[in-house]
């Protein structure tokens, strides 16, 4: 669902992710000072693997929702919803994700996804992401140090 947003005071967050080699696939490692931020970083990293985010403008905002039975399935379904947003109309490639609801008791996420429709002439084509996997998925929470990390393997 498309939502209204204001470009005033619109800031992009610091990049807190990396890509790790994995046999025939790629592992995304996202981190942050909260679990919410680590999830957001992991989602942006997935888009960054599909195209160079420097070429993406923030023209539209869509809202997605994801539900799970535990944190791992919530992360899986969150990334799967983002992949669907890219793979079907509006073919949105996101430069910023803002989770507006992060309910870890009921395992629900609502997220504003900022970006624009993917265009071959404008956006360099990266590697196609076929699917999200549970393989070697990790969610690490160090509450005392305010350090949260997620590791997800995406099928390419």
From Swiss-Prot:
It holds the Pfam family Archease. Transmembrane segments: none annotated. The keyword Calcium applies. InterPro entries: Archease, Archease_dom, Archease_dom_sf. Ca(2+) binds at residues 25, 155-156. One of its GO terms (cellular component) is tRNA-splicing ligase complex. One of its GO terms (molecular function) is metal ion binding. GO terms for biological process: positive regulation of axon regeneration; tRNA processing. PANTHER family: ARCHEASE (PTHR12682), PROTEIN ARCHEASE (PTHR12682:SF11). Belongs to the archease family. Component of the tRNA-splicing ligase complex required to facilitate the enzymatic turnover of catalytic subunit RtcB. Plays an important role in a RNA repair and splicing pathway which controls axon regeneration in response to peripheral (PNS) and central nervous system (CNS) injury, by activating splicing of Xbp1 to promote axon regeneration in response to axotomy. This is Protein archease-like. It comes from Drosophila melanogaster (Fruit fly). The lineage of its organism: Eukaryota, Metazoa, Ecdysozoa, Arthropoda, Hexapoda. The gene is Archease.
């Amino acid at each position: 669902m498309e939502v209204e947003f204001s470009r005033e005071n619109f800031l992009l967050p610091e990049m807190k992710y990396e890509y790790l080699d994995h046999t025939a696939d790629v592992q995304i490692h996202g981190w942050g000072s909260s679990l919410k931020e680590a999830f957001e970083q992991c989602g942006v990293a997935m888009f960054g693997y599909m195209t160079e985010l420097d070429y993406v403008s923030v023209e539209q905002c869509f809202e997605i929702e994801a539900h799970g039975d535990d944190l791992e399935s919530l992360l899986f379904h969150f990334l799967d919803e983002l992949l669907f947003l890219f793979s079907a109309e509006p073919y949105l490639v996101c430069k910023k994700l803002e989770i507006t609801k992060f309910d870890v008791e009921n395992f629900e996420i609502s997220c504003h996804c900022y970006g624009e429709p993917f265009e071959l002439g404008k956006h360099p084509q990266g590697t196609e992401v076929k699917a999200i996997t549970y393989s070697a998925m990790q969610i690490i929470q160090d509450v005392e140090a305010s350090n949260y990390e997620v590791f997800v393997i995406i099928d390419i």
